[in-house]
A protein has these predicted regions:
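C-terminal ends and interior cores of transmembrane alpha-helices
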Residues: 87-107, 378-396
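Intracellular loop-helix junctions on the cytosolic face of multi-pass helical membrane proteins
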Residues: 1-12, 141-142, 169-316, 320-327, ...
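Low-complexity, proline/glycine-enriched hydrophobic segments characteristic of transmembrane helices
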Residues: 332, 460-627
């Protein structure tokens, strides 16, 4: 038995890649579990904007493997790409930690966060396709152990994904926005561990069955002068043609269809990159046929991941706001912890599914890859059927049992086991060796598009309240009853937290978004009589710091804010001091928040927010999404239709695989 083999017949290199990927996925899923919560609870973005950023980030995370795969196949090799990618991702997580330190100054925190996301996106592009490709390279071509190897590798991914939300959520998702940074730091440590393990052991274990190193700089074949001239003419012409297609499609998607910049680029790449590969004249008939199978199934996989990846966006909002997370009256489970349900079930169920496929294979009844993936899509649709029925007649402010969310994740997990590891194995089996990493990148490209779509669809999540605008207030003045003079309260004092309720406020603000700021001439429209409830005081905001408006508090009785809406405006666990005013028509709330500065504890950061208490419901294809039931039906239709279509195409795709399954 060679140094690189185990008694169970798998190379030891598989378990090194298992551990490396486990810690990298710990880093990714730990940050992802906190990301939308960080955006909405710390940086105070609304759900639509947070969902859009989430979709852009996860979409680009799966787009850049296309570039990373190309660089590895042509220039760097797998090993160098993995190391470079890991270093960039560690830097990205460190920047996320830094962003969390400055969350009380949203402009600085957002800028640092965007740099962190950029590093994570580029780093993932080099890391992800290359480590998956190396798993297949550990085995001889046609080895029957490859499917089992990818199942084991997939368990490593999900073991990291299980631990991450629990560990990062325990220190980051505490209800206090100041703690998000510790979750990001934990994710950074996970990435550093992944790098240390891979770099220290790669030379010993990442080898072929005959002991040759895997993943080095690719050998350059030196062609004859005639071959080089012919190749350059065809290759360069083809590259320029598809680059032109990429640019043209981008312009169409951006200028005509109206997609955003990132969405337009992802959609354009989804057409141009596969087109570049399939038009390679060196491909023979069988190779081209098998590549078409990858493309067709990848198209249907978009529907799967667009529905499945709601876990990090709309289903996180659902866990936070609509799920009773109290466990036996002892404590509330963090919303981020629910993202551990899927990976732990993967770890538990993956061996059972592997045994099922083996048993069916012995009876000559094992479904081919396209059929398995059709089943996976069907299971996702079933999961949404269950949760949709549960929320159909849900009253305002009523929360559902966490059992139903667990049920959805359990069914989705079974669907994932029918689709995702089978897809990775299928790409390795069907891809020509010279295009192995690049086609793995194309496979992830479908996931990129799916994640972008997932973020956009999450933006249709119906909200009870919607934050219209937010402003930073460097200081405000309060005129108290019984005082002859105006007391000026600067943002570096704790006066507000310890003194009596003001009867008159003058608030000087700076607008983060000038387009959303109230017009100077329209200040009167905010001057409504307010309820005398002790919680509610009235105040207003000016567009610029030199515009000051004073409004006396009135005591006439007007509608109060419903409790379930109030909880969304003033989240439990925040150290912020709140004063809230509601307009006479009960459609708008004005919130003044004072939060201790994270760096200088003696300083108070002041923010002013305007909330729509009865926001307009979103609509998709002209159909208004009035409630959660209608929102979840969207995913039932998306996954269900894709499942049926792929089912009927399965036999045709099997023939196109030319003997492979």
């Amino acid at each position: 038995m060679s140094e690189a083999s185990t008694q169970k017949g798998h190379p030891k290199g598989l378990y090194l890649l298992f551990t490396t990927e486990m810690w990298e996925r710990f880093s990714y899923y730990g940050m992802r579990a906190l990301f939308t919560l960080y955006l909405t609870k710390a940086l105070l973005f609304d759900k639509a904007l947070a969902s859009a950023i989430y979709g852009d980030y996860t979409g680009l995370v799966y787009l850049t493997p296309l570039i990373g795969g190309f660089v590895a196949d042509r220039y760097w090799g797998n090993r160098k790409s993995i190391i470079v990618g890991g270093v960039l991702m560690a830097i990205g997580q460190l920047l996320m930690f830094t962003s969390g330190m400055f969350y009380t100054t949203p402009s600085s925190a957002t800028a640092i966060m965007l740099l962190g996301l950029l590093a994570l996106i580029v780093g993932n592009g080099f890391f992800k396709p290359n480590i998956s490709t190396m798993v297949g390279q550990l085995y001889p071509q046609g080895d029957k152990r490859i499917d089992a190897a990818f199942t084991i590798f997939y368990m490593g991914i999900n073991l990291g994904a299980f631990i991450a939300p629990l560990a990062c959520g325990a220190v980051g998702d505490t209800g206090d926005p100041a703690d998000f940074k510790w979750g990001f730091l934990a994710a950074c440590i996970g990435m550093i561990l992944s790098l240390i393990i891979f770099i220290s052991m790669k030379n010993k274990y990442i080898v072929t069955p005959d002991g040759s190193p895997i993943g080095g700089v690719p050998e350059k074949v030196v062609p004859t002068i005639e071959e080089k001239a012919a190749s350059d003419k065809v290759g360069n012409g083809r590259a320029y043609m598809w680059l032109g297609v990429l640019v043209t499609l981008y312009v169409i998607f951006k200028g005509v269809v109206g997609f955003d910049i990132i969405g337009s680029f992802i959609f354009a790449c989804t057409v141009a990159a596969p087109g570049y590969i399939i038009t390679d004249p060196s491909l023979d008939k069988i190779e081209r046929s098998r590549i078409w199978v990858i493309y067709i199934i990848a198209f249907f996989v978009i529907a799967f991941w667009a529905a499945f990846e709601q876990a990090g966006a709309s289903l996180t909002f659902f866990a936070e706001e609509q799920t009773d997370r109290n466990l036996f009256g002892w404590f509330d489970i963090p919303a981020s912890a629910f993202q551990s349900v899927n990976p732990i079930l993967i770890v538990a169920l993956a061996p059972l599914f592997a045994m099922l496929w083996v048993r069916l294979g012995k009876k000559n009844q094992e479904p081919a890859s396209p059929m398995k993936q059709s089943i996976g899509l069907f299971m996702v649709a079933v999961g949404y059927v269950i949760i949709a029925l549960v929320v159909k007649d849900l009253g305002p402010g009523v929360k559902v049992s966490m059992v139903w969310l667990f049920s959805l994740y359990a069914i989705h997990t079974m669907g994932e086991l029918c689709l995702s590891p089978i897809g990775l194995s299928m790409v390795v089996k069907l891809a020509p060796v010279r295009y192995s990493s690049l086609l793995m990148g194309v496979w992830f490209l479908s996931t990129a598009l799916a994640n972008k779509v997932a973020g956009d669809l999450s933006g249709y999540y119906p909200e009870d309240v919607h934050k219209k605008s937010a402003y930073g207030a460097p200081k405000f003045e309060a005129n108290f009853n019984g005082l002859d003079s105006t007391v000026v309260i600067d943002a570096n004092t704790k006066f507000f937290a310890s003194n009596a309720k003001p009867s008159m406020w003058t608030v000087a603000t700076t607008a983060d978004n000038k387009k959303e700021a109230p017009e100077k001439t329209g200040m009167d429209k905010f001057m409504h009589n307010m309820t005398a409830d002790p919680l509610v005081d009235y105040f207003t905001a000016a567009e610029e710091t030199d515009v000051v408006t004073s409004v006396a508090i009135q005591t006439s009785v007007t509608p109060k804010i419903e409790e379930h809406k109030l909880k969304q405006i003033t989240p439990k666990g925040e150290k912020t001091k709140f004063s809230i005013g509601v307009s006479e028509d009960a459609n708008t709330a004005y919130v003044l928040k004072m939060t201790p500065d994270e760096i200088n504890k003696e300083k108070m950061n002041v923010a002013f927010e305007v909330w729509d208490l009865n926001p307009k419901k979103p609509s998709i294809f002209g159909q208004e999404i009035k409630n959660l039931y209608e929102f979840f039906v969207v995913f039932i239709i998306l996954a269900g239709v894709a499942s049926v279509l792929l089912f009927f195409l399965s036999k045709t795709l099997l023939k196109m695989m030319h003997g492979l399954r």
